[in-house]
Amino acid sequence: MKTHLKNIWHQISSRFLAGGFVIVSTLLVACDEYFAFGEYKSFPKEGWYMRDTLHFVIDSLQEAGPYTLNLGIRTSTANPYPYKDLQVEFSQRWVSSSHKDTTDSLQPVTLIKTSLDTIDCHLVSDKGDNLGTGISNFQYIVPIDTLQLPVGAKGNIYIVHRMRKSTLPGIANVGVELRRVE
């Protein structure tokens, strides 16, 4: 009898555990439902060299609508970033892809937006507290722009640091995230 009850209990608890896993997995996937693009570039242990221009290509968006463009920065606690701020030059160029209109003629590529901005990223508070999230690496998300993009839009993004020191230690990764806004 005890063995039978243990087997029943084991089956019930296994089903709840499996069901909980499915629910948590679904929620995690649903959180990124509108994630259109994300890519990070890594740097060597020495850091980010000033001559290293990062290039990101966002190719052919699947949905039209409003998007937020974010800069992502990850710093390492193993090799700490020695400054409070990070200044980067952020260049973006968006075009609509060529497409056929209702008369079946090919329409030219259209420039949607081009900009070059210097972004001051605050990584550490005046009190010395990290403003990012994480434990062994700190993640910082810096909002850059809100864009209205058509289906098939393509983007080219270039990022370079504009700090006085030619090599920045402690920067592990820099990337770009594009999310559709609902």
Language-model region placement:
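Bacterial N-terminal signal peptides
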Residues: 18-26
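C-terminal motif of bacterial Sec signal peptides marking the signal peptidase cleavage site
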Residues: 29-30
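Coil residues (strongly favoring Ser/Thr
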Residues: 53, 60, 102-105, 118, ...
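Contiguous beta-strand segments within globular domains
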Residues: 62-73
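Short amphipathic, basic-aromatic surface patches that mediate peripheral association
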Residues: 73-80
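Short coil-to-beta strand junction motifs in C2/discoidin
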Residues: 81-88, 171
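A beta-strand/beta-hairpin structural motif
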Residues: 119-125, 130-143
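Internal, hydrophobic beta-strand segments that form the core of beta-sheet-rich folds
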Residues: 151-165, 170-180
